[in-house]
Amino acid sequence: MNYGVALFPSKPLQDLANSYRMRYDPHYTLIPPHVTLKEPFELEEQELPSVVKRVREIAKGVDPFPLEVYKVDTFYPVSNTLFFKIREHSALTELYEQLHTSPFKRNEKYSFVPHLTIGQNLSYDELSDNLGRLKMKQIQHEEIVDRIQLLYQLDNGSWTVYETFKLGKEE
Amino acid sequence: MNYGVALFPSKPLQDLANSYRMRYDPHYTLIPPHVTLKEPFELEEQELPSVVKRVREIAKGVDPFPLEVYKVDTFYPVSNTLFFKIREHSALTELYEQLHTSPFKRNEKYSFVPHLTIGQNLSYDELSDNLGRLKMKQIQHEEIVDRIQLLYQLDNGSWTVYETFKLGKEE
């Protein structure tokens, strides 16, 4: 079964992201707008409890932090993806690092670029037609993130939340 | 903002439900297959913490329980909805009752019929064409439910999980 770890921003930021995803992201209906903290990884059912425990520890070890979105950018030419760029923050980096440290596999393929995807699998023409205009857009939003989520993937490609983990120590 | 409380069954039951929802449920892409415990209700942001606290208490007060699905049925003529009928269970009824007891509003409109929707807003012809065949289907599935979820609705009608609540006392 495929699992992943993500954070869902607030409704206003999700609504804003969806206004783009609707047109540019074929995953629009598969999962709400999110910041991926750990790409899909395979897990046997018997491994789940120890992974849940580890994600809970990681979440407890990182305090709630400000998430700041400040522009539209692309991974082109690596991929034809459009995203809201997220300001680097030590807490966000720490979450990502911990989720890619033993017992989890490292991500050898990419280094962490905090982002919220608003378009993907675009043709070169779609990307270049829109990129200039979108890069000019004034995007400025800041909010506090206080939770992350572990999700699993259904056969139709959509994602269901398995568990929420609050950041920082329990009240 | 609209909130709701639901339980998501296991992946196998969700995949089975989606094989029907794909054809019969226009909400297919808005939310994964679920059992509604509390229909959408409006909440101001400042009311959220006390509601979260109350849902957490309710979840703690009910132990994990078996969820049994045993046939396809319909709410016709009240509504043209198709669903997997869920065997009544005191724990499930208790969750529903608590979520409709002060500070929450009672549901004056319907009494609780535990179900997992697989089709809705069907025309009379669609419903009657398929109902006989679906009612004959051998549906038999049982699993343990150990968590419920509080969700909120985005502007596009889709739902994001806000928080997971484990049933019973914390380990």
Swiss-Prot record, chains A, B:
Q: What is this protein called?
A: Putative phosphoesterase BH1439
User: Residue numbers of motif HXTX 2?
Assistant: 115-118
Its family remark reads: Belongs to the 2H phosphoesterase superfamily. YjcG family.
State if Kinase is listed as a keyword: no
The record's annotation in InterPro entries points to: 2H_phosphoesterase_YjcG-like, Cyclic_Pdiesterase, YjcG
Motif (HXTX 1) positions are 34-37
Q: Which PANTHER family does the protein's record reference?
A: PHOSPHOESTERASE SAOUHSC_00951-RELATED, PHOSPHOESTERASE YJCG-RELATED
Membrane spanning stretches = none
* Enzyme Commission no: 3.1.-.-
**A GO molecular function held by the record:** hydrolase activity, acting on ester bonds
Q: State the active site.
A: H34, H115
Task: Give the keywords, sorted.
Answer: Hydrolase
Top EC class of this enzyme: hydrolase
Cite the NCBIfam families for this sequence: PRK13679.1
- Looking at the Swiss-Prot or TrEMBL record, what is one Pfam family this protein matches? 2_5_RNA_ligase2
**Annotated source species:** Halalkalibacterium halodurans (strain ATCC BAA-125 / DSM 18197 / FERM 7344 / JCM 9153 / C-125) (Bacillus halodurans)
